[in-house]
């Protein structure tokens, strides 16, 4: 018999959906039924989500100064609130947990108005706009990189780390094996769940600048946006090298486990996953992030020695080629970085977050939860 329904709310990108998925698996192990509320974008990432049902609720962000656009967004939010209220009244969840992104706002607001226990999980080192809007209303705030007892809501905040999917936990069992001169070198390049156009343009040029001996060693996995597939595929064909390119890899965990180096953005889920697996990385924060959250996430891992951070404005093809030349000839350095990254990982984050969910659902306070963890 189920202990009750937990309703998870997540924005429709991998950065929000993946940690929610990891928690969902853990809650199901503990005897709960899990439902997910999100937007239509999440269908791409929710294929393995262990939910009894996935609900799409209307939502919108108010980012325009156009009065017509603002009015349309407010109408959509109001519609989402009504739909979320009906959903919560029907499901009667024991708790509603938000993972950030504007689609979480209607269900979390509806839950607080109905008196249902609520909490949010903030993946980044800087709190996002949706979570900021909800933080004063919820009973607890779990943080991936937020400092425990710090920030604007110290009495509510518990540092759990970012939960990672079972596939990542399995990949973490694979030890890092360095690639020595003359051996194949697995390079994984991606820009988060939605890709990064900059890498699609810069990497092929960088590879063309490498010595033939190094280029022949490379085995590349690169996530490429659909509109860039033809361009990148043509460059790869000209270079006559081994490369897998695709808009999305369902087996990314296994590919990361085989990687000798990762070049990627520094979204919270990405940084958490590569640290749990323990792989050296060159992190390139997304330069247009509103709160510079990716720069803060990257700095946290770089401080441990597990990653090198380079601003996109400084990452020319020549710079990439120089980095690859250096590290492909220095397997010992990459091994040290891999070990440092793994030490920074929090593989038990899903369990810690599930403990917090159960505590709040049972009516316990954050202060009580912290005392039991001490």
Curated annotation (Swiss-Prot):
GO MF annotation, one: UDP-N-acetyl-D-glucosamine:N-acetylmuramoyl-L-alanyl-D-glutamyl-meso-2,6-diaminopimelyl-D-alanyl-D-alanine-diphosphoundecaprenol 4-beta-N-acetylglucosaminlytransferase activity
Bilayer topology annotation: Peripheral membrane protein
Catalysis: reaction(s): di-trans,octa-cis-undecaprenyl diphospho-N-acetyl-alpha-D-muramoyl-L-alanyl-D-glutamyl-meso-2,6-diaminopimeloyl-D-alanyl-D-alanine + UDP-N-acetyl-alpha-D-glucosamine = di-trans,octa-cis-undecaprenyl diphospho-[N-acetyl-alpha-D-glucosaminyl-(1->4)]-N-acetyl-alpha-D-muramoyl-L-alanyl-D-glutamyl-meso-2,6-diaminopimeloyl-D-alanyl-D-alanine + UDP + H(+)
Predominant localisation class: membrane
Keywords in alphabetical order: Cell cycle, Cell division, Cell inner membrane, Cell membrane, Cell shape, Cell wall biogenesis/degradation, Glycosyltransferase, Membrane, Peptidoglycan synthesis, Transferase
Stored CDD domains: GT28_MurG
Broad class of enzyme this protein falls into: transferase
Protein name: UDP-N-acetylglucosamine--N-acetylmuramyl-(pentapeptide) pyrophosphoryl-undecaprenol N-acetylglucosamine transferase
Residues given in the record as UDP-N-acetyl-alpha-D-glucosamine binding sites: 13-15, 124, 165, 193, 294
Documented EC number(s): 2.4.1.227
Similarity comment text for this entry: Belongs to the glycosyltransferase 28 family. MurG subfamily.
Subcellular location: Cell inner membrane
């Amino acid at each position: 018999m189920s202990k009750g329904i937990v309703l998870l709310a997540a924005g429709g990108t991998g950065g929000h959906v993946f940690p929610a998925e990891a928690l969902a698996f853990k809650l199901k192990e503990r005897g709960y039924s899990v439902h997910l509320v999100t937007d239509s974008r999440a269908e791409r990432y929710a294929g393995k989500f262990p939910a009894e049902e996935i609900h799409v609720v209307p939502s919108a962000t108010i980012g325009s100064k156009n009065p017509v656009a603002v009015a349309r967004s407010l109408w959509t939010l109001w519609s989402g609130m009504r739909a979320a209220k009906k959903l919560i009244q029907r499901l009667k969840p024991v708790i509603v947990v938000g993972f950030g992104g504007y689609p979480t706002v209607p269900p979390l607001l509806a839950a607080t108005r109905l008196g249902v226990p609520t909490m949010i999980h903030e993946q980044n080192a800087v709190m996002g706009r949706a979570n900021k809007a909800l933080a004063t209303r919820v009973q607890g705030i779990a943080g991936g990189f937020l400092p425990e007892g710090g920030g604007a809501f110290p009495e509510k905040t518990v540092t759990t780390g970012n939960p990672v999917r079972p596939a990542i936990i399995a990949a973490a069992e694979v030890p890092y094996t360095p690639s020595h001169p003359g051996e194949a070198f697995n390079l994984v390049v991606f820009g988060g769940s939605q890709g990064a156009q900059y890498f699609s343009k810069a990497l092929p040029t960088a590879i063309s600048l490498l010595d033939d001996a190094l280029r022949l060693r490379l085995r590349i996995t690169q996530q490429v946006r659909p509109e860039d597939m033809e361009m990148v595929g043509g460059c790869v064909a000209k270079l006559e090298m081994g490369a897998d390119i695709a808009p999305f890899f369902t087996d990314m965990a296994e590919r990361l486990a085989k990687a000798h180096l990762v070049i990627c953005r520094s979204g919270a889920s990405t940084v958490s996953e590569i640290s749990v697996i323990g792989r050296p990385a060159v992190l390139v924060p997304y330069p247009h992030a509103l709160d510079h959250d990716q720069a803060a996430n990257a700095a946290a891992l770089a401080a441990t020695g597990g990653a090198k951070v380079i601003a996109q404005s400084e990452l020319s093809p020549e710079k990439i080629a120089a980095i690859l030349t250096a590290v492909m000839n220095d397997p010992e350095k990459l091994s040290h970085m891999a070990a440092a990254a793994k030490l920074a990982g929090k593989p038990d984050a899903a369990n810690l977050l599930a403990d917090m969910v159960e505590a709040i659902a049972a009516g316990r306070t954050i202060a009580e939860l912290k005392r039991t963890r001490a």
